[in-house]
């Protein structure tokens, strides 16, 4: 189904191209690190300082609050940087739908799903990004500029190779391994850019206006994701363009993936050059110095947090809590494409979801603001599990309503309503987990603590989706019809069946088997482990405080 336009780390992580994908938890930047090096003049370390605009030193006179208009250029720059960040995320999210239209195996789809992991794993290299930099160039620009240059150059080069990788030349099969490596690098670079931009946002704006950073983040990445996914899939589709945008039909869409990559690669190079030359970072020695922490100390701190009994219990439970949703979230959208639903129509269904996705967190937060936010998670879980079965029924029903190669309006209305109900349950669980993570995080090390909990929450959605995709093919039973004494258990057997005049027919679709198994596992978790998960709310504050050896 349509990709969810989601909060980023999201992968938003939000996983696009699926019927619905896990929301990535927003994780704030880690405490800036110091890198002890003899070349302090050239590489930032403990002696460097970043401006937090609006801070005043002890001897300074208080200044009048800054209007957002006085920093409009910085706000617009942040917004544009987040838009650029959303482009590779959206493009990566469109590839599964394109691959599915080319009839690749679900094993290949599972392999490609590793592309969506970097945003959930960026905690592993965030301390490095925060600590190592060139002082004279700027703490954030030291990573932002080379990262975006690499993205731009890579996009332009890929524009010359993507048709071959997708199998558009000479009817070859898509090179899934090369596509996975390529877009994994895209996501890795986008996650690195996210770390740098999040950190820069805190010092680019004054304290009065720093709240606009989260708005730029949400709006910018959503817009970029929309451009790279929904808009691209629509303009790339010959059927969509011929039906809605052209007077004379053409055999291809208005844009191709290679055109799109070349255009945005050029935009990345031009804008990055302008940022490198024209935008300066705030580095006044008189401003209060940020708390810094060494790279090694940061990793030691993370390990100390994980070893705490309460945190370890949370990690184990949250890593298994989303198994029940994996078939519905990861496979349903691809199954709809397999049944003939145009991928661009599924992508466009994300558009009416945007207002709902904005309103839902505001409404749900009223119920998660109390001392027991996980109650909402527990109450929403069975409804989301039942919607997984409804998704399976929707896939089963899809070929029965197809008419002359298309689908009636009422079909899309039912799909949209199903999607909206799913979003209500998904956001209820997402917001409650975010509220719980914020509630238990040790305020003395809030950035690192919160990021760790959110990272584990993201991984709890990533690995079940990958496994769910991987298991579809092994659970599917196919029979060779028209050729005696043949089967369709392996690719070679399928080829032999066709050569002997037969055809492989699906007797039992692994998606339905998996949907039932996942729901049973999900209800088992809800019944046996759910109460233990809720009991974590009863742990005292001391259970969540990390003892640090200074």
From Swiss-Prot:
Belongs to the SLC33A transporter family. Residues 1-74, 135-141, 197-217, 278-300, 366-375, 427-509 are cytoplasmic. The lineage of its organism: Eukaryota, Metazoa, Chordata, Craniata, Vertebrata. Residues 1-58 are annotated as: Disordered. Pfam families: Acatn. This is Acetyl-coenzyme A transporter 1. Homodimerizes. Keywords: Endoplasmic reticulum, Glycoprotein, Membrane, Phosphoprotein, Transmembrane, Transmembrane helix, Transport. Expressed in all adult tissues examined including brain, heart, kidney, liver and spleen, with maximum expression in liver and kidney.
């Amino acid at each position: 189904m349509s990709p969810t336009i989601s909060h980023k780390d999201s992968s938003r992580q939000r996983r696009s191209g699926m019927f619905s994908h896990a929301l990535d938890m927003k994780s704030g930047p880690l405490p800036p690190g110091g890198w002890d090096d003899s070349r302090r003049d050239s590489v930032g370390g403990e002696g460097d300082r970043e401006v937090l605009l609006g801070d005043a030193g002890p001897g300074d006179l208080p200044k009048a609050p800054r209007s957002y208009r006085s920093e409009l250029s910085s706000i617009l720059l942040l917004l544009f940087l987040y838009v650029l960040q959303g482009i590779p995320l959206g493009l990566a999210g469109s590839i599964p739908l394109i691959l599915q239209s080319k009839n690749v195996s679900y094993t290949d789809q599972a392999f490609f799903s590793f592309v969506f992991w970097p945003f959930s794993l960026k905690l592993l290299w965030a301390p490095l990004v925060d600590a190592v930099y060139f002082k004279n160039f700027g703490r954030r620009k030291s990573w932002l500029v080379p990262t975006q240059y690499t993205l731009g150059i890579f996009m332009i080069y890929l524009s010359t190779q993507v048709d071959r990788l997708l199998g558009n030349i000479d009817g070859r099969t898509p090179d899934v391994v090369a596509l996975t490596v390529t877009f994994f690098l895209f996501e890795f670079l986008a996650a690195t850019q996210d770390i740098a931009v999040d950190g820069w946002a805190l010092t680019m704006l004054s304290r009065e206006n720093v709240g606009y950073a989260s708005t730029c983040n949400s709006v910018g990445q959503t817009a970029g994701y929309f451009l790279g996914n929904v808009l691209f899939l629509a303009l790339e589709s010959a059927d969509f363009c011929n039906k809605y945008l052209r007077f004379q039909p053409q055999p291809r869409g208005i844009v191709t993936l290679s055109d799109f990559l070349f255009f945005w690669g050029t935009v990345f190079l031009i804008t990055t050059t302008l940022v490198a030359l024209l935008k300066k970072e705030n580095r006044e020695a008189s401003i209060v110095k940020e708390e810094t922490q060494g790279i090694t100390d940061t990793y030691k701190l993370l390990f100390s947090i994980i070893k705490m009994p309460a945190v370890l219990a949370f990690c184990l439970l949250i890593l298994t809590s989303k198994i029940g949703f994996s078939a519905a979230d990861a496979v349903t959208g691809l199954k709809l494409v397999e049944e003939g639903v145009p991928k661009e129509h599924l992508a466009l269904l994300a558009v009416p979801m945007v207002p709902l996705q904005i309103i839902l967190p505001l409404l749900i937060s009223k119920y998660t603001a109390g001392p027991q936010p996980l109650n909402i998670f527990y109450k929403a879980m069975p409804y989301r599990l039942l919607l997984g079965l409804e998704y399976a029924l929707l896939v089963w029903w899809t070929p029965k309503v197809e008419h002359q190669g298309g689908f009636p309006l009422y079909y899309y209305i039912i799909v949209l309503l199903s999607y909206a109900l799913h979003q209500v349950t998904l956001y209820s669980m997402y917001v409650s987990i975010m509220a719980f993570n914020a509630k238990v995080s040790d305020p003395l090390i809030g950035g690192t603590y919160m990021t760790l909990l959110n990272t584990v929450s993201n991984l709890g959605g990533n690995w079940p989706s990958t496994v769910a995709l991987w298991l579809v093919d092994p659970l599917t039973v196919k029979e060779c019809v028209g050729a005696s004494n043949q089967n369709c258990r392996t690719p070679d057997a399928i080829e032999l069946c066709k050569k002997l005049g037969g055809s492989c027919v699906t007797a039992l679709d692994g998606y339905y088997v998996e949907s039932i198994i996942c729901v049973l596992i999900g209800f088992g978790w809800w019944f046996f482990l759910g109460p233990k998960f809720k009991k974590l709310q009863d742990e005292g504050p001391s259970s969540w405080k990390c003892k640090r050896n200074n």
